[in-house]
Amino acid sequence: MKLIIGLGNPGKEYSGNRHNVGFQCLSRFAKDNHISFDKKCCLSRTGSGRINDEEIVLAKPQTYMNLSGKAASQLLRRYNLKAADIIVVQDDLDLPAGKIRLRLGGSAGGHNGISSIITDIGTKEFIRLKIGIGKPDSRNNGTEVVDHVLGNFGGEEREIMDKAITRASEALTCLLTFGLDTASNRFNS
């Protein structure tokens, strides 16, 4: 069994935010695989299904981003899983908008949701699917990081991100089917 956790903030007011790209990707993946988020469990909205005979659980924590680890640790206990069984889908400021990268382990890189998960599950050794949202443009009236991640994608940027979310959904399927090395070689950009 694999647990795929998409990171984001709950609530309609956050749904289009850059910081919610993990939720957006998981919604796309669920739609592509006919999975609905029809349960509430472990501080999360969850759905389950199968990909190539592998049972999967999708989870969108309903804590705020900075408390995502509470949901992740409850989910691991509920399903009796190890960190090696989870995949976390996250936004990444350090990647240009629309780029994706699969990676096992590593630091939180300043991402408070990832930091919370590392703290609460006690390890950084889990797979992350990072979706680039780019850094704020320093020429753009000094936009702060918080304003950037909680801002919505604009016109051209939205088109780039829609394609990235589709590609990230495909990367999840490849990861579940062929493993991390093959998926990384195919999708890391």
Curated annotation (Swiss-Prot):
The gene is pth. Its main location: cytoplasm. It comes from Dehalococcoides mccartyi (strain ATCC BAA-2266 / KCTC 15142 / 195) (Dehalococcoides ethenogenes (strain 195)). The keyword Transmembrane helix does not apply. Hydrolyzes ribosome-free peptidyl-tRNAs (with 1 or more amino acids incorporated), which drop off the ribosome during protein synthesis, or as a result of ribosome stalling. Catalyzes the release of premature peptidyl moieties from peptidyl-tRNA molecules trapped in stalled 50S ribosomal subunits, and thus maintains levels of free tRNAs and 50S ribosomes. InterPro entries: Pept_tRNA_hydro, Pept_tRNA_hydro_sf. Its EC number is 3.1.1.29. Monomer. This is Peptidyl-tRNA hydrolase. TRNA binds at residues 14, 64, 66, 112. Belongs to the PTH family. It is found in: Cytoplasm. The record marks 9 as: Discriminates between blocked and unblocked aminoacyl-tRNA.
